[in-house]
Swiss-Prot record:
Gene: PLR-1
Name by which UniProt lists this protein: Protein tyrosine phosphatase PRL-1
Keyword flag Ubl conjugation: no
Compartments in which it is found: Flagellar pocket
Protein purpose: Has protein tyrosine phosphatase activity.
Length: 176
């Protein structure tokens, strides 16, 4: 059984320096874990964020040196405050890595919970307006992010403002 995902690279401003890579994918099943381990290895993934209930054992990924973070929240809903805090803490930890490691994010179908976390990262660290971030993600993952999640992101107040010391620009984002 094959595995695939959508890789989103975020570059710092006008430069070619990649700040974050996100690999959005659907949840592995017990029979497809091996294919997903290979996919994660291909993109040098070290962190996997599981934004849904557990559908597979993390052991195969952990044996390859990957950390699986279980940060589940309700299907179709925006992330909880705990998930937001955990996600942003992970991004803070990874933002200055050179070269940046890919952060993989999945939910059941890779269309709701995982994409909204990536859109949140684009708003927080890329300084992208929420609609632009959602449009950017939807342009790469058809059907991603529902109206409830979009409305939440539109009301979200970023912790990192563009122009602040910790702010990054994703104006040069590219999908590979």
């Amino acid at each position: 059984m094959g595995a695939n995902g959508t890789l989103v690279e975020c570059k710092r401003g006008e430069s070619d320096a990649v700040v974050f890579r996100f690999l959005i994918f659907d949840a592995p099943s017990p029979s497809s874990v091996t294919a997903y381990v290979k996919l994660m290895q291909k993109y040098n993934v070290r962190h996997i964020v599981r934004a849904c209930g557990q559908t597979y054992s993390a052991e195969a990924f952990e044996k390859q040196g990957m950390v699986v973070h279980g940060w589940s929240f309700d299907d179709g809903a925006p992330p909880t405050q705990t998930v937001i805090d955990n996600w942003l803490n992970l991004l803070e930890q990874e933002k200055n890595k050179s070269p940046p490691e890919t952060i993989a994010v999945h939910c059941v179908a890779g269309l709701g919970r995982a994409p909204i976390l990536v859109a949140l990262a684009l708003v927080e660290y890329g300084g992208m307006p929420p609609l632009d971030a959602v449009g950017y993600v939807r342009g790469r993952r058809k059907g991603a992010i529902n109206q409830v999640q979009l409305n939440w992101l539109m009301r979200y107040k970023p912790r990192h403002q563009e122009g602040n010391e910790g702010s990054l620009s994703c104006a040069g984002c590219a999908v590979m």
